[in-house]
């Protein structure tokens, strides 16, 4: 494995070094109408699907192929896009400066406040990079997963954890509307399509912590996505073995009305059919969303966002076989199934936004949104398993075969779960800009309606085959002996309505210093009233950014922190048996983040080194455990904890003219649950908390601190792009991910007793892209290909190194009552073909 990885990295390094320097060089500066530099503006080449971002002084550089007419697009949020055509000669260096004009519907001064945010903890991502990214779960989320502090050990899911949190601690906004994650989904293969459609995206901002008061009440991260406002007619069509995507956009009525529509279909059967569990898979995931924008007058705009998705997952398992153990002690679990699982998830969202600008300094938004989801989970799965020891001796005739029986048994899993939720939001947000100082405020009323039906149980049938089983007892009928037991039984029906109110006020002040250095201070207060327990929570937050004026050095230092309350949505207040915990409270953390950006040049190319150190004191959290992507909370338990770590990211032109980046993170994440303990007998022997033996319990000993389920000591990710010199229509996109193992519990241990550690997660996905048509292509008159702007053919190899990554464990007992965790693996290597057409 190490040799393969070293060879791969050596190949990529040589490819980057071997770039042909005979290309032409285009450089210049991007400024606004006041001749102020626009930093982090996107400079993209349409024909090559490559691009760079400007530095803090608005400068950019691009190495371009010669003797080819290329189209450059200059874009930045809040500005009108600019387009230029260039044609360079061999060895030519040409300067091209561009002035971006403010949107008519955007306050000119508001752009300054947006750049001040860049000096804080928000990271911008280029949505175009997600279009050709090799991914199964989702384009935008896969880009987020490559950032420092972000952890995802499941390529089938779009979910991720950030700096020791869990899936429920991440905020996602689309055009200012909060998006919610599915409730009943238990595994990545059931999840389907994420909300964000990368084809519709204009701007992406992400923060891994320390975000300002304007963002909501979650403890880990915020992903803020803004959809495009079209200015011309365009469309795209994507076809692949995993599904299809289509989108259309345009303007009508002298630019007063614009539309943006996208639809997606996803079928992951080719990925699921190569997994360990064999059977009939029928996953069908579909969604459609649209954004309509109407300019009522010069001061008032109106937009409507609509979304509907239908995700269906059907599985009729037949058999499964998996090995576990060590080199000289290997065990095999064979399972034969009957039954089926049928899951259905329907989600809808509508949001109406009015944006009123009474003058050049004031911006008022009013957003009304309604979210609805109906999810059902039904299954009856009967499994008969056989656990055996595998012969590992070299040269043995039985090598690789099962040579002894260690246990047999059967189980039956049953569920009839249904979850229905409605969320209504009435939201006002305001912003006043005066010079370079920005005042923001907001107020929201929210109504949550939940109807939750829980009916699930597991039955284990030892039937005298798997031990221990009840011994014969004099005077007791065999039918009364507990050979048949419900290992788990949950039944409940909860109907709940909650009224919530939250708001914030936030001030950003910019202080220019005498030496042309700059300090930006952002301070705010967020308040939240949670109707479930009728309590108010206050969350003060502050951030400071300092940009010194150093000759030849481009540095920004940041310090941010504050209080972060997270009121439970619903999942956190539901006990494992389905009942609701009445005395629930909001989770609370105190965070401090110290970081900085250093922009420099190496090999005559621009780079940015970002580093952050953070400490999060978890003053009040709810313990939980994770199985695949399903989180089960211990709602009636309380814990304190901490997360601390270091994050690093190097972003720049590893290959001249194309952005790539690498992220490295170190983290320690622990907690101490109130009242947790373990048992010891009279001989001092430790007993499990689920103690059922006849040995007398002599004492209880506090357990103390332990690792949280999301603890991952080291994680590394790489997003790499390359192209062939003098043939830039051939391109490579690659993502590499490594993460050390995280804690896992067996099926009987309590949450605070980590049973073992998952193996490290290691994965490489690579896509080979050929651009078949670009805007410079010409065809005969009447040829329908004249309507095609760009066409790409991509061959994607998922899990290039064919590494078996563990997503969960199947726990069984042998004849000696020892629990064995048999690995459940994620997808092996397989190939996908994708055709992308842009009109």
Language-model regions: role of each:
Residues 365-369, 586-653, 793:
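Membrane-embedded beta-barrel scaffold of Gram-negative outer-membrane proteins
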Residues 318-319, 323, 548-593, 613-638, ...:
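Surface-exposed extracellular loop regions of Gram-negative outer-membrane beta-barrel proteins
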Residues 49-59:
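Short, acidic Ser/Thr/Gly-rich low-complexity loop/linker segments typical of extracellular
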């Amino acid at each position: 494995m190490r040799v393969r990885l070293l060879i791969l990295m050596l190949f990529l390094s040589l490819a980057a070094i071997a770039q042909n320097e005979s290309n032409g060089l285009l450089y210049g500066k991007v400024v606004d109408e006041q001749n102020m530099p626009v930093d982090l503006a996107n400079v993209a080449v349409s024909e090559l699907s490559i691009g760079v971002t400007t530095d803090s002084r608005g400068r950019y550089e691009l190495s371009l192929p010669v003797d080819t007419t290329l189209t450059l697009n200059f874009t930045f949020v809040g500005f009108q896009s600019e387009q230029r055509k260039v044609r360079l000669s061999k060895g030519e260096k040409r300067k091209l400066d561009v002035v971006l004009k403010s949107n008519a519907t955007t306050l000119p001064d508001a752009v300054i406040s947006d750049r001040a945010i860049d000096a804080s903890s928000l990271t911008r991502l280029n949505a175009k990079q997600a279009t050709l990214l090799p991914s199964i779960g989702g384009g935008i989320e896969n880009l987020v997963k490559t950032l420092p502090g972000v952890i995802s050990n499941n390529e089938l899911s779009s979910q991720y954890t950030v700096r020791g949190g869990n899936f429920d601690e991440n905020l996602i906004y689309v055009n200012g509307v909060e998006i919610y994650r599915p409730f009943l989904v238990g595994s990545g293969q059931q999840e389907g399509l994420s909300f964000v459609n990368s084809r519709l995206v204009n701007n992406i901002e992400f923060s891994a912590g320390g975000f300002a008061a304007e963002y909501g009440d979650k403890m880990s991260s915020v992903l803020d996505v803004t959809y495009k406002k079209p200015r011309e007619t365009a469309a795209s069509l994507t076809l692949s073995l995993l599904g299809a995507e289509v989108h259309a956009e345009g303007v009508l009525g002298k630019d007063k009305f614009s539309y943006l529509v996208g639809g997606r279909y996803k079928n992951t059967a080719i990925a699921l059919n190569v997994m360990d569990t064999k059977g009939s898979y029928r996953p069908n995931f579909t969604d459609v969303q649209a954004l309509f924008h109407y300019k009522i007058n010069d001061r008032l705009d109106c937009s409507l966002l609509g979304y509907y998705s239908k995700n269906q997952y059907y599985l009729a398992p037949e058999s499964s076989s998996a090995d576990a153990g060590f080199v000289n002690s290997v065990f095999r679990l064979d399972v034969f199934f009957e039954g089926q699982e049928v899951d259905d998830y329907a989600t809808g969202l509508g949001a109406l936004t009015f944006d009123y600008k009474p003058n050049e300094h004031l911006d008022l938004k009013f957003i009304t949104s309604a979210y609805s989801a109906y999810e059902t989970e039904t299954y009856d799965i009967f499994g008969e398993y056989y656990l055996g020891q595998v012969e590992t001796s070299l040269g043995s005739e039985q090598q690789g075969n099962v040579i002894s029986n260690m246990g047999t048994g059967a189980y039956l899993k049953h569920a009839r779960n249904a979850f229905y939720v409605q969320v209504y939001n009435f939201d006002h947000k305001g912003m006043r800009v005066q010079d370079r100082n920005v005042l923001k405020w907001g107020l929201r009323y929210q109504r949550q309606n939940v109807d939750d039906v829980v009916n699930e149980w597991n039955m284990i049938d030892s039937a005298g085959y798997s031990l221990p089983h009840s011994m014969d007892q004099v005077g007791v009928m065999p039918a009364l002996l507990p050979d048949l037991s419900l290992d788990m039984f949950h039944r409940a029906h909860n109907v709940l309505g909650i009224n919530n109110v939250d708001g914030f006020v936030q001030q950003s002040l910019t202080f220019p210093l005498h030496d042309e250095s700059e300090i930006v201070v952002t301070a705010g207060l967020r308040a939240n009233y949670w109707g479930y327990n009728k309590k108010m929570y206050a969350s003060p937050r502050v951030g400071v950014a300092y940009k010194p004026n150093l000759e030849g050095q481009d540095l920004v230092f940041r310090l941010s922190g504050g209080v972060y309350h997270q009121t439970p949505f619903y999942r956190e207040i539901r006990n494992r048996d389905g009942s609701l915990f009445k005395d629930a409270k909001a989770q609370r953390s105190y965070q401090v983040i110290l970081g900085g950006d250093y922009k420099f040049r190496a090999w005559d190319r621009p780079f940015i080194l970002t580093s952050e150190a953070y400490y999060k004191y978890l003053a009040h959290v709810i313990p939980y455990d994770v199985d695949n992507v399903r989180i089960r909370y211990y709602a009636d338990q309380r814990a304190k904890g901490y997360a601390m770590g270091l994050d690093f990211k190097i972003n720049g032109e590893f290959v001249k003219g194309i952005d790539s980046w690498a992220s490295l993170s170190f983290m320690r994440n622990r907690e101490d649950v109130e009242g947790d303990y373990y048992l010891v007998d009279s001989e001092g022997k430790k007993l499990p908390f689920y103690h059922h033996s006849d040995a007398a319990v002599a004492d209880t000993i506090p357990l103390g601190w332990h690792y949280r389920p999301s603890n991952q000591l080291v994680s590394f990710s790489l997003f790499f792009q390359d192209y062939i010199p003098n043939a830039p229509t051939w391109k490579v996109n690659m993502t590499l991910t490594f993460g050390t193992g995280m804690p896992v519990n067996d099926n009987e241990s309590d949450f605070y007793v980590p049973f073992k550690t998952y193996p490290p997660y290691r994965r490489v996905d690579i896509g080979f892209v050929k651009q078949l048509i670009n805007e410079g292509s010409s065809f005969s008159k009447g040829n329908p290909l004249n309507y095609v702007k760009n066409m790409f053919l991509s061959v994607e190899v998922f899990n290039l190194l064919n590494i078996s990554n563990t997503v969960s464990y199947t726990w069984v007992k042998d004849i000696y009552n020892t629990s064995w965790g048999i690995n459940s693996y994620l997808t092996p290597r397989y190939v996908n073909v994708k055709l992308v057409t842009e009109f």
